[in-house]
A protein has these predicted regions:
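C-terminal beta-rich recognition modules with glycine/proline-rich loops and embedded aromatic residues
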Residues: 6, 13-120
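Short strand-edge motifs at loop-to-beta-strand transitions and within beta-strands
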Residues: 2-4
Length: 120
């Protein structure tokens, strides 16, 4: 919580800006099965890659040297933030991925998804 103790005027405004740039999150070292993997997050949201957007989702590896960009898809659940970035596909070729918030997976038919992804 943030306490703002002052005398307020009708025209006063509060602007709160929080960083929501996409980032990679690593698991605790005690989670050995997740060694060499990372999850994608932005702000408080954890993202996943879903088969609906990434046909080769099960074999994608994150390119940790690549960039990620936060975007928006108005056609997904009446508007959803998405992250796009660079990956390596199952044939060791550069590829791109689209990640959606974990809360949004499974809304476009049956298909797999992943939260934890191998890194390059």
């Amino acid at each position: 919580y943030a306490l703002l103790d002052r005398v307020w005027n009708p025209a006063d405004r509060i602007v709160l800006e929080l960083p929501v740039a996409p980032r990679l999150v690593r698991a605790h070292k005690a989670a050995r099965e997740l060694d060499g993997m990372a999850a994608i997050a932005a702000g408080p949201l954890v993202y996943c890659i879903e088969q609906a957007d990434n046909a080769d989702y099960a074999r994608l590896r994150l390119d940790t040297a690549g960039s990620m960009e936060l975007g928006y898809r108005s056609d997904l659940m009446d508007g959803t933030p998405v992250i796009t970035g660079t990956a390596i596909d199952g044939k060791d070729a550069k590829s791109t991925f689209t990640a959606i918030p974990y809360y949004a997976f499974g809304n476009r038919g049956n298909g797999g998804y992943r939260v934890w992804l191998p890194t390059r």
